[in-house]
């Protein structure tokens, strides 16, 4: 049974998760000698995935870890975590970090709602549709989106959005069909992503040649990514796929705020309005979901099993 209390717990988990995830781009920007986007992404998944993997092994034990690891779709989802990072870090220099977030996170929210309907998790509510549309409009204002962008960058960001949507929908399905904790399932996903990223990370780590860069990588992996995914798992466990992806639109808002305080970036009036629009839309969604749980009884919803 998913209660109102559980829904609120899921929302809080996503808020904390988006805080940690929003620091990723800023961490790379303040490095002394940052490596290629692909290398930084690989190190992030390698260390962060290993961190949450060790955490869930300690908390849930080898038996539960192995039970989830034996599920074929889990390996597919593990690969999605790595492919998502590669796609995002490829798109960023092509079309910009902000627009990459707009395309990837915006499309993932729409696709997650669509997949939820197709796979029987319930039709999107009017509040979810309104909140998502308004939030994406706000994100468009925040990023200053324009049409002069490279097609390959757009396609990469859309691919990242597809990976994120499938990850959330199939991840929620795995949690329900296996009756497993969201942190455990997300931890196994990330452990697989860590194994896939390890060769790329270890082969491209020559740029980590200063104490500050080492400390930032250790923050980006074991702290931001590990802790971020622990709280993300709480959101996956308690909320619907569409709501998870829509609430995560907070991530680019957080990245913008970090850019202002740490990188001396300027926020235009249009960008400020965009931030306020996003926050208003997500506040509406969060209030609605905290009052009425998304899933009254997990036994009654559809699964992909």
Which residues are covered by each model-predicted region?
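Hydrophobic/small/kink-forming positions within alpha-helical transmembrane segments
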Residues: 22, 26, 78, 82-86, ...
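Hydrophobic transmembrane alpha-helices of multi-pass small-molecule transport proteins
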Residues: 52, 81, 124-144, 164, ...
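Specific alpha-helical transmembrane segments that line the substrate/conduction pathway
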Residues: 39-50, 89-122, 241-260
């Amino acid at each position: 049974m998913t209660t109102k209390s559980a829904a609120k717990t899921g929302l809080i988990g996503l808020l904390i998760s988006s805080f940690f995830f929003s620091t990723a781009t800023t961490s790379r920007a303040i490095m002394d000698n940052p490596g290629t986007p692909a290398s930084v992404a690989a190190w992030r998944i390698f260390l962060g995935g290993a961190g949450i993997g060790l955490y869930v092994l300690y908390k849930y034990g080898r038996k539960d870890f192995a039970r989830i690891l034996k599920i074929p779709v889990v390996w597919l989802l593990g690969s999605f975590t790595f492919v998502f990072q590669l796609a995002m870090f490829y798109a960023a220099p092509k079309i910009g970090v902000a627009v990459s977030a707009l395309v990837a996170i915006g499309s993932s929210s729409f696709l997650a709602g669509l997949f939820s309907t197709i796979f029987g998790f319930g039709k999107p509510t009017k509040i979810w549709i309104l909140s998502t549309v308004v939030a994406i409009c706000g994100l468009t204002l925040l990023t200053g989106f324009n049409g002069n962008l490279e097609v390959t960058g757009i396609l990469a960001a859309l691919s990242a959005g597809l990976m994120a949507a499938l990850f959330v929908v199939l991840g929620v399905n795995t949690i329900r069909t296996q009756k497993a904790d969201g942190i455990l399932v997300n931890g196994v996903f990330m452990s697989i992503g860590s194994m896939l990223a390890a060769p790329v990370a270890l082969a491209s780590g020559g740029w980590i040649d200063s104490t500050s860069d080492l400390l930032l990588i250790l923050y980006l992996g074991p702290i931001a990514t590990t802790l971020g995914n622990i709280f993300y798992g709480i959101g996956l466990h308690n909320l619907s796929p569409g709501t998870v992806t829509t609430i995560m639109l907070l991530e680019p808002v957080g990245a913008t705020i970090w850019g202002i305080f740490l990188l001396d970036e300027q926020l235009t009036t249009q960008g400020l309005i965009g931030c306020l629009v996003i926050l208003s839309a997500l506040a509406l969604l969060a209030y609605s979901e905290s009052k009425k749980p998304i899933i009254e009884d997990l036994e009654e919803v559809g699964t992909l099993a």
